[in-house]
Each structure stands twice: as structure tokens, then as C-alpha cells.
């Protein structure tokens, strides 16, 4: 994490040493007491003076350069709160039930806690939770092999092991989720082949030489509302979170859903079966396919957990109060959000409501609502970590703030900060709550990511408001504007993301009008030209296009449809998506 305070401090110290020596040479009589023109160990008193001055001036320069966040943070926090929140550490875990004892499917609810082994100098246990519910079926992927049909087409053979005790009438195989746990080139190519290059789907039962044709298909995962990685604010737009998730954690989109298997009647007592996925084009010979590239029962996890903050004693003389996580002063725990604030005093207790919910008195013309509210601000601390400050307000709070001291109890959502990645060599997510009848083991399939913090430089908040104040067509006015819009969501300093954005060469849009079933339909045909060399293969291009297509569908006007076309250079290949008709308001 970039420590701005340390950067400004070092800059001021360099200036004092370099400029001080030059000043001492030019004016030896005035600078003699600074002891700067002598070789050897510097005077500790002078060093202490320089360090104190450098810290003060560094903070002053940092304040001058921060583009007045007081003017922008309040508006951004109310309308687009996701721009001010940290994206915690993320990973994907596989839940493995004990197959031999499973008789029916069970569902693991969202929010299942998954913990790591003790890591770091304080042996801290990092706590994650699942982002969505996941069904556990009496199935397991046993083998994955890429073979060839007699006509030369490639075939992906997936061998499933089954519980012999399973009652298949109690198992719903609709939308069977598979995670592509492979390196990026293999994973993106598999994603493309299974979702866009499927020629036929067959089921082969043991002891049966004839294979059964299945009317099925694979659909891309990670784009549904229930697939969100973190909670969405009431006023936030779904499309913006989609962009953040794509540029921050692309592993979320490495899921595919098998549709159609629910229409097959599996015999009782079956020990396994093979699924043969016939592809419409040859599989690249330089991309290896191994048994562990496909996994069942996988789900993303996020480093969030509920805890209490240290009680606050409100004296009425301060406008902001620094929050500290209770009992977790380990140097890593950070506050993600404040969920509940309750005050207690001599006259009783009172509940505070979030200011952004407009549920306080006067908000949205409510005159019988609670008269106390709270608001939070996130500031960069001198340690480089982000501190959360609590701001209180309301008519009753203003009236009672001076005569009575009040103690606040706070329930917050916290995160372990950078600890999971800093202790990466020993970080394994291999423990979870046992909430089901069937014993379940867990392991992480990818390394926990570093948390990502909102940008604070390059006038970020002003660029956000400029972007969000424009319309849909303005975003598509040129390649530069579209690149700038997408760059607002590229919070990671990742070279591959920069290459994908730089690969946008041109953007054009044309209005479409046509009559269909007696109605006049209006739409927009969006054409984006890409440089194929900026992506890691054809699968990477298709995934980028799928993300852009979903975003445009959410962003478009409710009374218009849109259609995306990608032109990939230098081949000139055309990739066209279906029309997106929005029956409701975006979000």
C-alpha cells in the first residue's frame, strides 16, 4: 500500500538536507548552528528538529494537494458510496462434502464463515465469508480429459463420481456450477469454448456403450445479482459494481453453469457418469488440460466479519470521533462499514440512523422519524492505513450534546486489511463452520488478493462526478472517453488491465428504429474496435466483451434496447451480442 504521509515526509527531509547544505555553503555564518557543512554523524538535535518540521510540512503539503475532499466526499458517499469503500481481500474456495454419506442435495447459505490458519506475528486468524448460497450435490469431478472425435472435433470429457446412496429425485441439477480453476490462458479459453463453441453435449453411463444426447448448454457465471462479491448500497448502480469486480477480481467470472442435466434421469446406485462436451473448433494443442481445471461446489469468499468497536464517550465538543475495532488492536484490522450506532446516557438510550438512508427527521419529508443520525468518513492515517471517523448530527442530538455525556455502542463490519496477503506463504483457508448434516472440508483455490483502496490522487472524485454527470451517449462519444470511464474502476495497478483499456481503438454508435408486432422499437447499435494484441487470447476478448455488454445493458435507457459489436483487429473479426431489452430502470 502506498503511504502518502511517508512519501511527503521523505520529500521534505530530502529538501531540508539538500537545500540546507547549499544554504550553509552560501551563508556559513547564518547556518553554523545547523551543523550541515561537517562530515560524519549529524547532530541528533538537528535531526530531531528536521524530522518534526518535515512531518508538519508534509501533512500541510498533503492537505494542499488533496483537491478538497470535503467538497466531494459527502456527495459521492450519498450517491455512489462504492467509490469510497475498500475492496477487501478476495478468494475462491472449494467446499468438499463427504460424498460417501450424501443422500440428497444440501444448500450452504450465504455468509458461511471460512477462516485461515493463524498467520502473522500475532497468529491472527483471518475471517472470510461466502458471498452467495451454494448447493452441495452428491457429485464430484473425478477426471477431466481433452480427446478428439472421429471427425476431428475436440471433446472435453468430464468424469463425475456419484454417491451410491443418493436419491436423485431429491437432487436438483439445474444450473450445475463449475469453476475453471486454471491459469488465465487455459481458463479463459475453456470459458470461451464451453459457452460459445459448444457443438453437442452427451451423457455416458457406466456399462452402456451408447451415449445419450442432452439438450443442454453452458451459461457464463458471475453476472447475476446474487453473484455480487460485496453488499450493494441502496443508491448504488449495479453496473458500476460489475466493472469494479471485473477489474479487481476476474476469478469471479471463471464460473460456468451447466443447464439441461436436470432433464436426465440418473439410475439409483450409480457410481459415476461421463459428460462429453463436443466443441465446434479444435482445442489449442499448447494449452494443457488436467484433472483439476474444473471444480464443483466453489464459491467466492470475502474478508469481512462482524465485530464491535471500542465504546465512544461523546463530550459534545468534537465534530468527528475516531473509531477503533474492539479487542483487535493488531495493527491490521480495518473498519469496512458501520452497521449500527446506539447511544446511552442518564435519560435512556437512543438509536442513530445512517444519514445516507434519509430515515432521520427531515429526510425525505419525514417529521416523525428518529432525530439522530450518523455519518462516516474515511481518511488516510499517518501509518498509511485508512481510519474511519464518525460524525453525529440531528435535531435532538444538537439539543442534548452539551448538558449530557453519552456513550455510544457500535456494531461494525471489519476486515483483516493486508494481513492475508502479507502472510501469504502460510495463509490457507481450510476451516469453516459445520452448518450441514454432511461433513464439509474447505480449501482455497487461489491466493487471497490484496485489499484495494479507492484512488486518492489525480482528482479522482472530481473525475467521478464528471463521469456520472454525463449521459449514456456521451460515454460512447469516443474511444478516449470510454477508456477514461472504464479506467475509473481499474483500482489495481495491473499491467493486464492497462493493456485491455489501451486496446480500445475506436467507438461508434448508431441509432436503430424498426417496427415489430405493431410497435416502434428504438435502440442503439454500439461498435467497439479492439486491438487483439492487448488481450491474452480470444477467450480474454470474449470475457471483456461479455462484461461490456452486460454493463451497457444495465446503463441503457429503459425505453431503448442496445446491441454490442466488437471488431477485433488486425484480423477484422466481428463478434456480435444479442440485443439487450431493458424492461425496468437500471440498478
Where do the model's predicted regions map?
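Short linear motifs embedded in intrinsically disordered, proline/glycine-rich low-complexity segments
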Residues: 1, 7-11, 15, 27, ...
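Short, Φ-rich (hydrophobic/aromatic) sequence segments
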Residues: 45, 49, 53, 75, ...
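Residues at beta-strand starts and edge strands
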Residues: 89-91, 152-156, 172-174, 197, ...
Amino acid at each position: 500500500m502506498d503511504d502518502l504521509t511517508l512519501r511527503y515526509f521523505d520529500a521534505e527531509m530530502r529538501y531540508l538536507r539538500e537545500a540546507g547544505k547549499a544554504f550553509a555553503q552560501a551563508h556559513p555564518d547564518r547556518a553554523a548552528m545547523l551543523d550541515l557543512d561537517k562530515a560524519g554523524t549529524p547532530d541528533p538535535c538537528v535531526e530531531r528538529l528536521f524530522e518534526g518540521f518535515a512531518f508538519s510540512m508534509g501533512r500541510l503539503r498533503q492537505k494542499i494537494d488533496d483537491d478538497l475532499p470535503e467538497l466531494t466526499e459527502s456527495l459521492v458517499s450519498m450517491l455512489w458510496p462504492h467509490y469510497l469503500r475498500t475492496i477487501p481481500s478476495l478468494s475462491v474456495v472449494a467446499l468438499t462434502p463427504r460424498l460417501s454419506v450424501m443422500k440428497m442435495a444440501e444448500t450452504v447459505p450465504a455468509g458461511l464463515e471460512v477462516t485461515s490458519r493463524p498467520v502473522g506475528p500475532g497468529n491472527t486468524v483471518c475471517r472470510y465469508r461466502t458471498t452467495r448460497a451454494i448447493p452441495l450435490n452428491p457429485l464430484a469431478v473425478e477426471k477431466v480429459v481433452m480427446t478428439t472425435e472421429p471427425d476431428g472435433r475436440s471433446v472435453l470429457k468430464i468424469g463425475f463420481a456419484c454417491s451410491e446412496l443418493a436419491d436423485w429425485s431429491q437432487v436438483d441439477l439445474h444450473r450445475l456450477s463449475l469453476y475453471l480453476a486454471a491459469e488465465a490462458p487455459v481458463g479463459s479459453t475453456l470459458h470461451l469454448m464451453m459457452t460459445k463453441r459448444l457443438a453437442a453435449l452427451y451423457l455416458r453411463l457406466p456399462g452402456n456403450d451408447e451415449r445419450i444426447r442432452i439438450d443442454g448448454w453452458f451459461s457464463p457465471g458471475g453476472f447475476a445479482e446474487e453473484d455480487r462479491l460485496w453488499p450493494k448500497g441502496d443508491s448504488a448502480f449495479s453496473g458500476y459494481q460489475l466493472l469494479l469486480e471485473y477489474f479487481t477480481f476476474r476469478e469471479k467470472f471463471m464460473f460456468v453453469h451447466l443447464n439441461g442435466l436436470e432433464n436426465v434421469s440418473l439410475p439409483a446406485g450409480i457410481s459415476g457418469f461421463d459428460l462429453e462436451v463436443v466443441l465446434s473448433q479444435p482445442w489449442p494443442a499448447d494449452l494443457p488440460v488436467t484433472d483439476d481445471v474444473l471444480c464443483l461446489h466453489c464459491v467466492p469468499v470475502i474478508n469481512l466479519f462482524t465485530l464491535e468497536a471500542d465504546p465512544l464517550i461523546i463530550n459534545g465538543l468534537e465534530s468527528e470521533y475516531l473509531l477503533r475495532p474492539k479487542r483487535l488492536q493488531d495493527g491490521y484490522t480495518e473498519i469496512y462499514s458501520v452497521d449500527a450506532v446506539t447511544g446511552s446516557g442518564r435519560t435512556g438510550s437512543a438509536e442513530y440512523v445512517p444519514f445516507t438512508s434519509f430515515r432521520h427527521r427531515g429526510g425525505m419529508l419525514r417529521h416523525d422519524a428518529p432525530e439522530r443520525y450518523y455519518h462516516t468518513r474515511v481518511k488516510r492515517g499517518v501509518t498509511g492505513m485508512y481510519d474511519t471517523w464518525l460524525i453525529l448530527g440531528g435535531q435532538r442530538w444538537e439539543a442534548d450534546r452539551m448538558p449530557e455525556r453519552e456513550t455510544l455502542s457500535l456494531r461494525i463490519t471489519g476486515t483483516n486489511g493486508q494481513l492475508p496477503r502479507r502472510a501469504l506463504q502460510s495463509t490457507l483457508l481450510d476451516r469453516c463452520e459445520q452448518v450441514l448434516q454432511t461433513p464439509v472440508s474447505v480449501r482455497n483455490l487461489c491466493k487471497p488478493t490484496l485489499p484495494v483502496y479507492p484512488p486518492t490522487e489525480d482528482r479522482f472524485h472530481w473525475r467521478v462526478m464528471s463521469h456520472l454527470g454525463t449521459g449514456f451517449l456521451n460515454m460512447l462519444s469516443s474511444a478516449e472517453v470510454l477508456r477514461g470511464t472504464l479506467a475509473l474502476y481499474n483500482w489495481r495497478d495491473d499491467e493486464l488491465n492497462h493493456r485491455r483499456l489501451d486496446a480500445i481503438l475506436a467507438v461508434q454508435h448508431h441509432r436503430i428504429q424498426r417496427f415489430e408486432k405493431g410497435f416502434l422499437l428504438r435502440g442503439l447499435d454500439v461498435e467497439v474496435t479492439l486491438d487483439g494484441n492487448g488481450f491474452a487470447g480470444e477467450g480474454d476478448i470474449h470475457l471483456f466483451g461479455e462484461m461490456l455488454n452486460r454493463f451497457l445493458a444495465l446503463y441503457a435507457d429503459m425505453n431503448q434496447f442496445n446491441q454490442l459489436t466488437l471488431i477485433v483487429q488486425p484480423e477484422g473479426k466481428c463478434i456480435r451480442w444479442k440485443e439487450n431489452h431493458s424492461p425496468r430502470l437500471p440498478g
